[in-house]
Amino acid sequence: MIMAVIQPKRLDSVRQALAEIDITGVTATEVKGFGRQKGHTELYRGAEFVVDFLPKVKLEIAITAEQVDKVIDTIVGACKVNGGKIGDGKIFVTNLEQVVRIRTGETGSKAL
């Protein structure tokens, strides 16, 4: 299982790149967060506000163990532009214990 947190502007390029390697099942959620990128200061009606949490997109991709490296390389390639910079995102890989396709009852890799 891969969970990637990326910049919203990279979502379409990641989706297209994943489709090119036959990964078509992705869950995308709009989230907010910060890491080393931190927040930024904005002006609104003359007053300064610190925006700590920045908009991000969290992708969840259920794949087989054999697909992990290729999916990671694909996401990095679609998100790392101009040599990469703070805020490009992170990728987390976890073990997927079980998958069940609700409609058919299929389990394991057949359910992916």
Enumerate the predicted regions with their spans:
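Positively charged, small/polar-rich N-terminal and surface patches that mediate targeting and assembly
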Residues: 1-112
